[in-house]
């Protein structure tokens, strides 16, 4: 009995040592792999920076400017254009049916202070149609709430009023998450003061969960991979879509001078005109089903035009270009 017990005990100990040994080997391999991935990230940095710098020379009907750090550079993706900035640029192009010039001012490793110092002076040279800001993750390691808020205020005060600014992403580590919570409170409060739209990046990355985030991360376990950047882009998409629609409305319903004079109100005025135009089109369609009389009365109410009586003989050919007196193009 004793011998059987001793054999069982030895088997258990050897088995446990085997598990511990395997775990240690796995841990060493994991650390080694993470270090190798970190080195690959270092090698990526100049490649991504050069790629975006070359893209700045491209022409486009719309201008998209990005402020940020290595995530805006797309570090960790299989190609620079597969980062969230590249994905958003592609979405803007598809939604607007216009070509897009991307000026990516982001700098890998940048903090809020670095963005204020290095990126804001360059931003002054551009008048972007779309602007995104995602900065602050690199502040967390040595987090100072007062300095963070001063830098965020400087950045948010310098970007266009239509800029979309992002929360810091979920980091899942309790100590870091406590700092992130303070940082995101500042992001929301200052963005609200400046009237900026906040992309819910923390909310969305937290919803994904730690397990999926692990598989959505590059080998360094810090930067997203292609799947991770799709998650990041999804946090910006609703606000970017709304901005693209507003730009389209401004270009359709306002002259350049009118848009300049209206300033921050240009989007609201253009969207109101677009909504009025849509409502008017629906009303005209409804009136058309009731006959020509209701159509003319409604057109007069909408445009202030007066219908010209039709005095042609029945045999006259119809006018190829009918119009109303006072109708605007």
Residue ranges of predicted features:
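Alpha-helical cap/lid subdomain in secreted, periplasmic
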Residues: 117-249, 281-287, 292-312, 324-328
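N-proximal short alpha-helices
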Residues: 3, 61, 104, 164, ...
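Electropositive phosphate-/nucleotide-binding environments in soluble metabolic enzymes
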Residues: 7, 82, 226, 230
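N-terminal secretory targeting modules
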Residues: 1-65, 210, 241-329
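A structure-centric signal for secondary-structure junctions around beta-strands
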Residues: 59-61, 99, 160
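Conserved SGNH/GDSL esterase-like catalytic core that processes O-acyl groups on lipids
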Residues: 63-65, 71-147, 295-299
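Short, charge-rich amphipathic segments
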Residues: 11-29, 48-56, 80-95, 113-129, ...
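Secondary-structure boundary/capping motif
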Residues: 53-57, 61-63, 92-95, 195, ...
């Amino acid at each position: 009995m004793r011998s059987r017990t001793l054999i069982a005990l030895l088997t258990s100990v050897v088995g446990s040592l085997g598990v511990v040994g395997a775990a240690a080997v796995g841990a060493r391999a994991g650390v080694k792999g993470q270090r190798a991935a970190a080195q690959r990230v270092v090698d990526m940095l100049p490649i991504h920076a050069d790629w975006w710098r070359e893209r700045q020379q491209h022409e486009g009907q719309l201008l998209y400017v990005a402020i940020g750090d290595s995530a805006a550079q797309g570090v960790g993706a299989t190609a620079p254009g597969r980062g969230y900035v590249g994905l958003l640029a592609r979405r803007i192009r598809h939604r607007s049916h216009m070509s897009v010039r991307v000026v990516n001012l982001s700098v890998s490793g940048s903090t809020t202070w670095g963005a204020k110092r290095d990126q804001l002076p360059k931003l002054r040279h551009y008048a972007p149609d779309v602007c995104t800001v995602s900065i602050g993750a690199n502040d967390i390691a040595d987090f100072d709430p007062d300095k963070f808020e001063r830098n965020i205020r400087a950045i948010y005060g310098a970007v266009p009023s239509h800029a979309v600014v992002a929360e810091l992403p979920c980091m899942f580590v309790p100590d870091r998450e406590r700092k992130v919570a303070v940082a995101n409170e500042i992001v929301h409060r200052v963005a609200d003061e400046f009237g900026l739209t906040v992309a819910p990046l923390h909310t969305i990355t937290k919803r994904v969960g730690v397990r999926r985030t692990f598989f959505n991360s590059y080998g360094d376990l810090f930067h997203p991979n292609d799947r991770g950047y799709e998650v990041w882009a999804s946090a910006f998409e609703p606000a970017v879509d709304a901005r693209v629609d507003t730009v389209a409305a401004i270009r359709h319903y306002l002259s350049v001078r009118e848009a300049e004079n209206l300033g921050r109100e240009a989007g609201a005025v253009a969207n109101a005109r677009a909504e009025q135009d849509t409502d008017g089109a629906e009303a005209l369609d409804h009136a058309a089903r009731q006959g020509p009389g209701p159509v003319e009365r409604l057109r007069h109410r909408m445009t202030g035009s007066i219908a010209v009586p039709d005095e042609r003989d029945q045999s006259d050919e119809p006018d190829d270009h009918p119009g109303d007196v006072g109708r605007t193009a």
